[in-house]
């Protein structure tokens, strides 16, 4: 299979998934101005202030025919919704793709009031609706019982995990998402981050050290890259071939 053919089939796979998702019908209030209110019709957790500043930011260095740069966030409900498709993509095209996971910083803090959201409890009902739409288990009660004040801590922890092992870092991301979406755990708390690290074979002590130092810089670099590439929300995937040609899939 040629590189061009590989890219074509992979893009077709993702575009079909996007179209199938957008064909579902669900009536929800239009609150997508707030990033925590992901729009099921487009599959996007929006970043209202994102602006594109540099279209040539990425230089491809992949060893496989296609590199996918995946901008995501640990508490992005649409990103949780795309998990089955992403796993299928890896199973069908794993020999031809490599995925570069990047953090986008969905929720810096609660110092804003946008799109009908002013406090964590406003998100609870929305997550329940998203669960029905994607047919993925999500328990919105986390926002009533033990709400998160930011998505930055688990994002930085993921960058620290990547410093140890890329494969284990992906497993770590899956685990902390299970914690927040299924188990109602506040994954900004170190006790849960440390537990997820240990369960996925990471060195929790080293993770803590990196989390407090180098991982912060790596996370900030991801935010800058997202800004430069014009990422407006999550999930966003850039498909790049060996000639540095790019295609973007936005939403789900």
Language-model region placement:
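Bacterial N-terminal signal peptides that target proteins for export
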Residues: 1-7
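Bacterial N-terminal signal peptides
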Residues: 9-16
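Boundary at the C-terminal end of the N-terminal hydrophobic targeting segment
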Residues: 19-21
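C-terminal cap of thioredoxin/glutaredoxin-like
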Residues: 34-48, 71-72, 83-91, 175-252
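A short beta-strand-turn-helix
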Residues: 44-66
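Short N-terminal binding/cap micro-motifs at the start of the first secondary-structure element
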Residues: 45, 77-79, 110
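Local sequence-structure signature of Cys/Sec-based thiol-disulfide redox active-site neighborhoods
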Residues: 59-88, 99
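Structural alpha/beta surface segment adjacent to cysteine/selenocysteine redox centers
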Residues: 83-184, 189-190
């Amino acid at each position: 299979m040629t590189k061009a053919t590989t890219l074509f089939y992979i893009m077709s796979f993702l575009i079909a998934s996007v179209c199938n998702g957008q064909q579902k019908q669900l009536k929800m209030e239009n609150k997508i101005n707030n990033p925590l209110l992901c729009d099921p019709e487009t599959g996007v957790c929006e970043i209202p202030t994102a602006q594109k500043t540099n279209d040539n930011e990425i230089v491809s260095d992949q060893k496989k025919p296609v590199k996918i740069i995946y901008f995501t966030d640990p508490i992005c409900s649409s990103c949780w919704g795309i998990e089955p498709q992403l796993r299928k993509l890896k199973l069908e095209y794993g020999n031809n793709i490599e995925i570069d996971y990047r953090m986008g910083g969905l929720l810096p803090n609660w110092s804003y009031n946008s799109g009908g959201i002013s406090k964590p409890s406003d998100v609870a009902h929305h997550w329940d609706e998203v669960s029905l739409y994607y047919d993925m288990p999500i328990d919105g009660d986390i926002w009533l019982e033990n709400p998160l004040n930011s998505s930055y801590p688990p994002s930085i922890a993921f960058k620290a995990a990547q410093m140890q092992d890329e494969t284990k870092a992906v497993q770590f991301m899956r685990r902390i998402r299970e914690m927040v979406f299924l188990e109602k755990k506040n994954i900004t708390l170190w006790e849960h981050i440390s537990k997820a690290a240990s369960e996925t074979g990471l060195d929790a002590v080293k993770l803590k050290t990196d989390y407090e130092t180098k991982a912060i810089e790596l996370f900030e670099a991801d935010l800058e890259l997202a800004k430069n590439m014009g990422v407006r929300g999550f999930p966003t995937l850039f498909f790049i071939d060996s000639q540095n040609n790019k295609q973007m899939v936005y939403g789900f």
